[in-house]
Amino acid sequence: MSVHELKRPLAVEWPAELLGDLPKALEQLHHWAQITPLHTALRHKRQGQWYAWRWIDALRDVERLADGLRQQGFDEQSRLALSGAFEPNLLLLALAAQSVGGQVLTLADDVDPEVLHQQLWRIRPTHAYVQDRRQVRHWQSANRLDFTQLLGPTEPAQHLQRWWQPAGETALWSEEGTHWQGGLAVLLEQWLNSGHGLAFPESQASARRDRSEVAPTGLLLSPARLQHLADEIESRLARPGTWRRRLCDWAIAHPQSGLRRLLKNRVRKLLGFQRLAYIWQPLKANAETTWLAEFKRDIA
């Protein structure tokens, strides 16, 4: 592949997506690493245990990854394709690639092999990072990166022996992946703009349990995932038309009802929302369910 080919504007179409320039991202990372170096920046559950990255750890990892990328031939003319669940490795690698000056693209992690091959032929990444082992064989044409090799020898992420929440600690939460169109930009911007910690579950299957352990103060979720949460709430309520459901509907319709507060507190605790104070949503949000509307009304 020639340099001239790489300089051509990419005709990127979903399920592939180009991560736009985030000019302040590295500056913000340096900022938080300087003023709150020991505060937790990232959390991720792995094999049943929570791990944490302080802001100073995140900055150092980005710098190490940038050096590792350069050693793998990544430069201003390169393209890095990312696919998989959002978690610390993926976010830090995206920031490292941008710091080198190369392009970062995401490819939805839920496409079938035929679509995947078409997209890889179209975007022609010079390097790739794929998490799902089931997908690896479909990325044979790409120059797949080994995260551990890129990072080099370093201290392992701080292991949280016991999960605890200091009074007033904020924690953003996401349980998404590259299937969320525009999601990576949302996460990076919200995380780095706020300086709040950002936590991720071990998997989609364990998301509710892991979320309950974190009790996040903010949600960074796609409209589709918010709808999934709404459906989960709906599935735990009594069937429509029953007296129990009519009682729930009546309680929601009467703001001063003690029963309403009891029901909402129960739902909040069930979903890990007892500390929830912020729900990210796009400027043009779709219609939302009654329960999510209630949560947002409380927050406001």
Predicted regions and their residues:
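Conserved pre-ATP/AMP-binding loop-to-beta segment of ANL
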Residues: P37-T40, R144-S174, T178
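A short helix-loop-beta submotif of the ANL/AMP-binding
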Residues: A85-L105, D109-P113, T126, L172, ...
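Conserved AMP-binding/adenylate-forming core of the ANL superfamily
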Residues: L42-G73, A85-E87
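Conserved ATP-dependent adenylate/AMP-binding module captured primarily in the ANL superfamily
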Residues: A94, D109-W139, P156-W173, L188, ...
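Conserved AMP-binding/adenylation subdomain of ANL enzymes
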Residues: H159-A171, T178-N265, E294-D298
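Flexible, non-catalytic linker and terminal segments flanking ANL/adenylate-forming cores
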Residues: M1-L22
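A short N-terminal helical cap/helix-turn-helix that marks the beginning
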Residues: L19-L42, R60
